[in-house]
Each structure stands twice: as C-alpha cells, then as structure tokens.
C-alpha cells in the first residue's frame, strides 16, 4: 500500500516564491531566509528587493509587460536558482497564482508568509467564512459595489493611499453611507496603525499606500439592496426600453447557467442587463456585450460600473460581423485580485475554472442573442462560436425572429418555448390583467446532444406542420 505524500517533490531548478511581510527580513522564517540567501537571482518589486541583504545575487525588478517578460526572464536564467519575492502569502491574490498557472505546480515552490488578509481579519476579529475579500489593486474601485449587502463584511485590498476615500465615496453613492470603515495600514510592520470612521463624512487624509479597508456594510434607510440572484428590478438599470425584462431575464440566466470563471457573449445587448447579471453571479465571471448603438453601449458601461462589474467589455458593432475574432481578444477578468498590478493570467494547466486573466483566448461558454435574431447568419454565427458544453439562449418578439428560431429548432433541436407575463393594473375603477408582449425563447446546449425534432410524425404538430395553427 502506498504511503501518503505530504510534500510534493520540487525540481532543483524550480522557481521559488517567498512571501515577505511588512516586517521584512526579520519576519521571515528560517526556511525562507535560507532560500533567499541561496538564490542566484532575486525578482520582485523595489520595496521587497530592498528588504533583503544584497549578497552575491542579481536583483531584478518586475518586467514589463509582466507575463511575457516573466517567461523571457526565466528562460534567460534557466539553470540558476531564481527566487521571486512577493507580498505575504503569494497564493492569496498574489503572483504565486500567476506562476503556477504559467509553469505548473511541479515547477514552482511557494514559501508563504502571513497575508495582509489574514492579518486584517485577525485585527478585526472576523472569521474568514464571514467576510469577503475584494481587490482593487490596479482595478476600478466600483468592483466593490457587487459585494455590497446589508451586514456584509468586506476587506478591500487597496491600490494606493487614495483608495479608502474612493471606497467611502462609493459607499455613500450606493446607499451605504452609514457603513463603518477601518483602514489598516502597514500590517505586521513597525508603523502599523488603524484609522476608523463612517463612510459618510470620511475625512481621513491619505497616508500609507499599503492598506486594507475593512467595511462593515450598513444600508441607509430607504436605499435599495441588490441581490446577486438574477432578476434585478428593471429600474436598477438605465435603459431606453431595450431591456430583457426582469422575469424573463431571470429565466434566461437560468438557461444560460453561469458557472464560476465562465465567459458570456451578450449579442444585441441593449442595456447590458443579461451580461451584467451574469457577471454578478460570481466574481470570476466574464462577459462581452456587443451593441451596435454607441449611445446604448455607453449606457451599458454606466450600468456595469454602477452595479459593480466595471470589467464588462463592451464592443460597439453590428453582429454577426462584430463577432469575428472575438474569441481571440482580451476579456478582462473580474476576479483578478493580484496584490501587484499586472496583466492577466491564463487558464490553469489541466483545466478547471480559470483563476484570473486578461489575455484569455477562449470561446464563449454561453451566448445570449437578444437582438438581431432574424439577421441572416446570426444564429449560425453564435452557434459556431460556442465552445464545448456551450449554451445559447435566443429571444424573439417579432414574427420574423420567431421564424428564425423555429427554423433553428427544427435544424438543431434544443428547446423552444413561448413566455408571456401579465401584471395587475388599474382598469377603470377596478383592476385587470395587462399582458406584456409574448416572447419566444430558443435554448440550445452542446452538452445535451439534443436531436432535432421529428416533423409531422403523427404524434404532435412539428415546425411547419399545417396542423400547428392555434386552436
């Protein structure tokens, strides 16, 4: 019987990543010090490189561009002992994750220190399972908006000294002005300190760029709290009427079935509501909104920022032409949470949900076709773009678009359904039902291997059957 292996063997020429805290060399473990002392090449930021003794070692700052530069750097120094210095725990929103994804677990050894996240939780007395981490390092501060909820505890990893004031301003704008903020600076170092206050009226001056903002979310009276469950109210979005309505949007997203790290194309995005709610489901989710109207495209960007997913990519153009080449372009990753600003990271070796990236070249996992269904070649272009296991959902409200979906259903199978919603409304002095426009929905999944329906088999009317008229 084989014995369990508690330590994976690492090749002698492996890249070693050493985590270092604000206390510098003095805070390193014996193992970490020995690793750094034995290095031929040290790679890291200027601050970290300055924390360790010079010795007989080559010190190199982060290359630019980051990812491509790292590959060149390690190739140049192949056969030498290369040590990378990183903040705290390199696998908590750090460069260790990037290196593992680039080179694999057998080529990278990690020697962690205590992360700023762990120190912040310890200072605040917050259990890990009862708080959420959001990084705005080199990112749009509006990413915090997705995580806001009454009673939520947030640890915001700051980009610089101005981040606390930006977070306070965002909290006030989103109706969380009563939230308490604690700015934890230089955690683990000699200059560690904490500033506290309330978001509304936050007037603390910017100080150390090395800070974590702890937020205890409190919703202001009368303010709206937005759920992460798909189906936000229509008035949560700025729109001109071109929006997939709330009830139908919730059902549409159930069919699109977002999973962590997956990519959606929202074709004919209108207000961007489907793409935005897709990204809100999980912080690693990505989306591209394709919209021909520049004014609507600008509106999508505003909606995405206001609803906490500013990394939504908006493409101004008409489909299907605008879809050409999209699978080979950069899509920002809403979950990238590096403690050092850097370009994105690739999909882990061996598959699995991606942990972060801005330079992926993958096909969409799902496509929502909300406009232009009747345009020749549109449905086929969307189907051709789908990756393995991909899902497509298309909506139609006109006879021409419905005919296109009926044809697609006859050709490819899947599911074809009609949805109608009626709402109670005043009818004179009484109340009656007001119907919304009936919507036809075609959904298709590559994973289902659905066969096209048989036409006119005698059991039920098929597409094009003369007996399919309403009765």
Language model features: what each stretch is:
Residues 87-151, 320-321, 365-366, 410-434, ...:
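Class I SAM-dependent methyltransferase SAM-binding "motif I" and its flanking Rossmann-like core
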Residues 386-387:
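Helix-to-beta-strand junctions that scaffold the AdoMet/dcAdoMet cofactor pocket
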Residues 2-17, 30-33, 80-82, 150-242, ...:
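A contiguous loop/helix-start segment that scaffolds small-molecule binding in enzyme catalytic cores
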Residues 196-210, 401-403, 408-452, 470-471:
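Active-site capping/gating segments
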Residues 293-350, 354-361:
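S-adenosyl-L-methionine
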Residues 271-283:
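Conserved SAM-binding loop of SAM-dependent methyltransferases across substrates and taxa
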Residues 261-270:
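Conserved class I S-adenosyl-L-methionine
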Residues 1-114, 118-119, 141, 148, ...:
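Class I S-adenosyl-L-methionine
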């Amino acid at each position: 019987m084989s014995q369990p292996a508690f330590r994976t063997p690492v090749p002698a020429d492996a890249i070693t990543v050493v985590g270092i805290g604000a206390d510098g060399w003095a805070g390193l473990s014996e193992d970490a010090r020995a690793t750094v002392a034995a290095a031929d090449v040290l790679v890291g930021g200027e601050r970290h490189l300055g924390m360790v003794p010079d010795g007989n070692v080559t010190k190199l700052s982060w290359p630019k561009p980051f990812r491509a530069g790292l590959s060149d750097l390690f190739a140049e120094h192949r056969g030498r002992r290369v040590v990378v210095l990183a903040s705290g725990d390199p696998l908590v929103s750090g460069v260790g994750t990037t290196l593992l994804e680039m080179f694999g677990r057998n080529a990278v050894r990690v020697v962690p220190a205590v992360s700023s996240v762990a120190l912040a939780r310890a200072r605040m007395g917050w259990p890990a399972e009862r708080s959420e981490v959001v990084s705005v390092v080199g990112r749009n501060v509006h990413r915090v908006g997705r995580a806001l909820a009454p009673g939520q505890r947030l640890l915001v990893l700051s980009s610089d000294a101005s981040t606390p004031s930006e977070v306070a301003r965002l909290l006030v704008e989103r109706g969380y002005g009563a939230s308490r903020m604690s700015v934890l600076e230089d955690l683990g170092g000699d200059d560690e300190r904490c500033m506290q206050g309330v978001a509304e009226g936050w007037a603390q001056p910017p100080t150390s760029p090395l800070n974590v903002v702890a937020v205890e979310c409190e919703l202001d009276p009368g303010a709206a709290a937005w759920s992460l469950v798909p189906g936000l109210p229509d008035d949560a979005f700025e729109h001109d009427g071109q929006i997939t309505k709330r009830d139908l949007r919730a059902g549409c997203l159930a069919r699109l079935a977002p999973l962590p790290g997956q990519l959606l194309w929202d074709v004919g995005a209108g207000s961007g509501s489907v793409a935005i709610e897709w990204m809100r489901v999980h912080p690693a989710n990505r989306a591209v909104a394709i919209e021909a109207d520049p004014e609507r495209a600008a509106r999508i960007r505003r909606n995405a920022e206001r609803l906490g997913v500013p990394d939504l990519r908006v493409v101004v153009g008409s489909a299907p032409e605008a879809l050409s080449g999209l699978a080979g372009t950069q899509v920002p990753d809403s979950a990238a949470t590096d403690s050092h600003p850097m370009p994105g990271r690739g999909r882990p070796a061996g598959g699995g949900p991606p942990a972060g990236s801005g330079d992926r070249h993958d096909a969409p996992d799902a496509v929502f076709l909300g406009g232009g269904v009747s345009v020749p070649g549109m449905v086929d272009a969307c189907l051709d773009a789908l990756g393995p296991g991909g899902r497509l959902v298309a909506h139609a409200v006109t006879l021409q678009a419905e005919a296109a979906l009926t044809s697609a259903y006859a050709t490819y199978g899947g599911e074809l359904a009609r949805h109608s919603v009626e709402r109670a409304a005043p009818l004179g002095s009484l109340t009656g039902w007001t119907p919304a426009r009936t919507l036809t929905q075609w959904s298709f999944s590559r994973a289902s291997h659905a066969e096209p329906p048989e036409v006119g088999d005698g059991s039920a009317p098929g597409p094009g059957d003369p007996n399919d008229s309403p009765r």
